[in-house]
Amino acid sequence: MKTVVFAYHDMGCLGIEALLAAGYEISAIFTHTDNPGEKAFYGSVARLAAERGIPVYAPDDVNHPLWVERIAQLSPDVIFSFYYRHLICDEILQLAPAGAFNLHGSLLTKYRGRAPLNWVLVNGETETGVTLHRMVTRADAGAIVAQLRVAIAPDDIAITLHHKLCHAARQLLEQTLPAIKHGNILEIAQRENEATCFGRRTPDDSFLEWHKPASVLHNMVRAVADPWPGAFSYVGNQKFTVWSSRVHPHASKAQPGSVISVAPLLIACGDGALEIVTGQASDGITMQGSQLAQTLGLVQGSRLNSQPACAARRRTRVLILGVNGFIGNHLTERLLREDHYEVYGLDIGSDAISRFLNHPHFHFVEGDISIHSEWIEYHVKKCDVVLPLVAIATPIEYTRNPLRVFELDFEENLRIIRYCVKYRKRIIFPSTSEVYGMCSDKYFDEDHSNLIVGPVNKPRWIYSVSKQLLDRVIWAYGEKEGLQFTLFRPFNWMGPRLDNLNAARIGSSRAITQLILNLVEGSPIKLIDGGKQKRCFTDIRDGIEALYRIIENAGNRCDGEIINIGNPENEASIEELGEMLLASFEKHPLRHHFPPFAGFRVVESSSYYGKGYQDVEHRKPSIRNAHRCLDWEPKIDMQETIDETLDFFLRTVDLTDKPS
């Protein structure tokens, strides 16, 4: 049975050995080049492949069409992935008639995502395991083929648990690979309501927060002990690593982080105390706790910190132009929920952000970006991150006011982009799913899909082309002048405060707001060209969480990236959206205040949008970049979004003159 293997780490090596022992013919192996900043304590898949005479590759992007074509030429019967670190696209997964299977280091459906070995220790679990499951587009979500449980002992650390999991994986593969080969497997669907998902960990995540219980800190030490980078803390500005520890049920009134004793080295925690058994100063060698205390100059009563004493306390300053808009006001709410952001905003109105106007870390000026150029330039210079969210983004305006769309969406934003270049500020720019135009790909991919628009005499494309050209300008500034940027492409975000019903009355709103207005007023729901066009609708909360992670930019992973933010699972036609909305409306507690439903009416796009309109039949995002850069995937079902959006708008209606 011919197979193509994607593999890395010890699990990759043992997976390859298991396949060969089971009689599989491995046509090619795909792996990664080693990261020079990572301690390589594990086996080399590349070396093993070379020793076994198997072709081995380490492409930067295995999902590139050229690699998809080369893998297709290998005609694999089955595909296996053993700890390969990138998501594999659906085009590759579909190449194998017998399917694709992944080995995951947890008991799915728990601990989907990255670093499950470390996360189970961080969270103090007493059991984990290994799972072989069928691969689907979503990470770790396919049906389970086989599992083995592994007990976690109280004295297990990351490396000992790693060895246990490797042993279990060998057993599991030895038992299961022959069954896959003969097509004799029983698959069990995962229960989505029980799933948990965890993101990538970085060395910076392992700081010891002394206000937490000693047991929690001890678990952190176990989770990242050598050969992982280790848990750490600071004495003043000097960093040190804790390699091993013990929990003491020490009753102390000392402040968390205070040194209770130096022999043994005992630190007060939020609950109990942590003994540092072995550790290492940043410029030293590993030593036992009391010697480390002497090296660091610790005495009873000394204080340890989670960050350097001189660490900057200043909040990150975020400039949001168009702060009163749909994305702007929800993003402001998310940023102000944290304690390390200062938000500066400009917009022509403030109705959606009135709830923030008295917040001490929110600063708002009412104004127009085409007039307040000096204010904008000053605040670009002053702030750390710039989000120019001002745009005309309603389809009817593309044909009704194409020049205004160009002037605002392109010309005004180009000026802001140039300010960011001038003052070397990071820009997070809202591209759009519209840039893909009439692309025929099943999934619209940021790095590979063609951007296809209609002829010049179809002005509906002026928005798409304006945004696309700005994307290209930003990319060029990044390449040639070092502009720090991220482009994000929202796919049909929905939720409360999307447009308003007054905008819908003049046709200048998005689809769901227009449909809600029809229900409120008792007018027919208009289905443009039958409403068969499909879109992938995304809850604003999912979208904002992804955007927040772009702003956070952990490990600078978002720099220079284009990221689709959408929900491929929430695909529906406009007609289906209308039917779901109607069902929600009919059972809403305020339903009796509104007129009877007036039915659906099919209208031609030219009569609704005017001359020069073209529509797009489907628009489904690939979200592999969002997985890779943000450890993000959408979670909220479309029906929940519809219910909450409808409820919000119905409660904004003045019911005094409505029938009861």
From Swiss-Prot:
PANTHER family: BIFUNCTIONAL POLYMYXIN RESISTANCE PROTEIN ARNA, UDP-D-APIOSE_UDP-D-XYLOSE SYNTHASE 2
Marked site (Transition state stabilizer) residue numbers: 102
Pathway annotation from the record: Nucleotide-sugar biosynthesis; UDP-4-deoxy-4-formamido-beta-L-arabinose biosynthesis; UDP-4-deoxy-4-formamido-beta-L-arabinose from UDP-alpha-D-glucuronate: step 1/3; Nucleotide-sugar biosynthesis; UDP-4-deoxy-4-formamido-beta-L-arabinose biosynthesis; UDP-4-deoxy-4-formamido-beta-L-arabinose from UDP-alpha-D-glucuronate: step 3/3; Bacterial outer membrane biogenesis; lipopolysaccharide biosynthesis
HAMAP family: ArnA (MF_01166)
Source organism of the structure: Shigella dysenteriae serotype 1 (strain Sd197)
UniProt: UDP-alpha-D-glucuronate binding residues: 393, 398, 432-433, 460, 492, 526-535, 613
Quaternary context: Homohexamer, formed by a dimer of trimers.
Record site feature (Raises pKa of active site His), residues: 140
Active site feature: 104, 434, 619
UniProt entry keywords in alphabetical sequence: Antibiotic resistance, Lipid A biosynthesis, Lipid biosynthesis, Lipid metabolism, Lipopolysaccharide biosynthesis, Multifunctional enzyme, NAD, Oxidoreductase, Transferase
Chain positions covered by the region annotation Formyltransferase ArnAFT: 1-304
Any single Gene Ontology cellular-component annotation: membrane
GO molecular function: carboxy-lyase activity; UDP-4-amino-4-deoxy-L-arabinose formyltransferase activity; UDP-glucuronate dehydrogenase activity
Protein name, per record: Bifunctional polymyxin resistance protein ArnA
Enzyme Commission identifier(s): 2.1.2.13, 1.1.1.305
UniProt binding sites for (6R)-10-formyltetrahydrofolate: 86-88, 114, 136-140
Family (UniProt): In the N-terminal section; belongs to the Fmt family. UDP-L-Ara4N formyltransferase subfamily. In the C-terminal section; belongs to the NAD(P)-dependent epimerase/dehydratase family. UDP-glucuronic acid decarboxylase subfamily.
Region called Dehydrogenase ArnADH, residue ranges: 314-660
Any single biological process term in GO: response to antibiotic
InterPro entries assigned: Arna-like_SDR_e, Bifun_polymyxin_resist_ArnA, Epimerase_deHydtase, Formyl_trans_C, Formyl_transf_N, Formyl_transf_N_sf, Formyl_transferase-like_C_sf, Lipid_A_modif_metabolic_enz
Residues the entry annotates as binding NAD(+): 347, 368-369
